[in-house]
Swiss-Prot record:
This is Defensin-like protein 175. It is found in: Secreted. The keyword Heme does not apply. The lineage of its organism: Eukaryota, Viridiplantae, Streptophyta, Embryophyta, Tracheophyta. Belongs to the DEFL family.
Length: 87
């Protein structure tokens, strides 16, 4: 009986760890079929301004917080869009 109990301890520990630990990674959204021309404008068109546009392997990538992260005020979304596009 003791052997059966001890064989359940390790799986239970892993279940508890996976249930309590939250993965903290940024969200990546790949725009696979389009080259890097005007990557920042494309990211602003589909995602909030908190996303960063970079070019990886000739593909536009928008990196930023996950959608379920803190809410983004609408004022920041539309304020100085021209500056954000040019940056």
């Amino acid at each position: 009986m003791a052997k059966a109990t001890s064989s359940l301890v390790v799986p239970i520990i892993f279940l508890v760890i996976f249930a309590l630990v939250e993965q903290n990674t940024g969200c990546f959204d790949y725009d696979v079929y389009q080259p890097c021309d005007h990557c920042r404008e494309r990211c602003l068109k589909y995602y909030p301004v908190t996303r960063k546009a970079i070019c990886r392997k000739n593909h536009c990538v928008c990196i930023g917080p996950c959608p379920n992260d803190k809410a983004i005020p609408n004022v920041k979304l539309f304020k100085n869009v021209k500056e954000q596009i040019l940056s």
